[in-house]
């Protein structure tokens, strides 16, 4: 009987160990997303805006939760062939994981999914001159994410009407990546 209890405990602990990186899709602990991130993939329904020199091709390097619940993003983007560093604050809204910012129009930024330790997926809706653009971005804590996270990102893109032709692998694309 004791042997069965010990075996059950060992199996429970082993199962818990494999679920350390469970995806979170709501009720985010925003303090846990603070830190360094690397852009892995980006997708949009307007490819011009995320292609080289596109105004929405942003390489987040660091995220910081501010005291008021807003997020500070330190990122880079290409401007006339040069990698330029910029800091931007996305203001929190009444919804957990939702933020707003004025950049190249009006933007709603949603944290879609994260496990805090490996990856994070953001959705941004930009409205510029009456035109709506969707952008999704996959970031990792390390420079290269595994294929599992990339497949999950592709599945989420599909939910927003974007297929594999709308996704750019950013790990091999720009000077701003490193």
Curated annotation (Swiss-Prot):
The keyword Signal is assigned to this record: yes
SUPFAM superfamilies xrefs: Lipocalins (SSF50814)
UniProt keyword terms in alphabetical order: Disulfide bond, Glycoprotein, Secreted, Signal, Transport
Gene Ontology cellular component annotations, sorted alphabetically: extracellular region
Locations listed in the record: Secreted
GO MF term (any one): small molecule binding
Disulfide bonds: 83-176
Predominant location category: secreted
Signal peptide interval: 1-16
Known tissue expression: Expressed in epididymis. Not detected in all other tissues tested.
Entry-listed glycosylation sites: 46, 68, 129
Entry-linked PANTHER family: EPIDIDYMAL-SPECIFIC LIPOCALIN-9, LIPOCALIN
Family: Belongs to the calycin superfamily. Lipocalin family.
Name recorded for this polypeptide: Epididymal-specific lipocalin-9
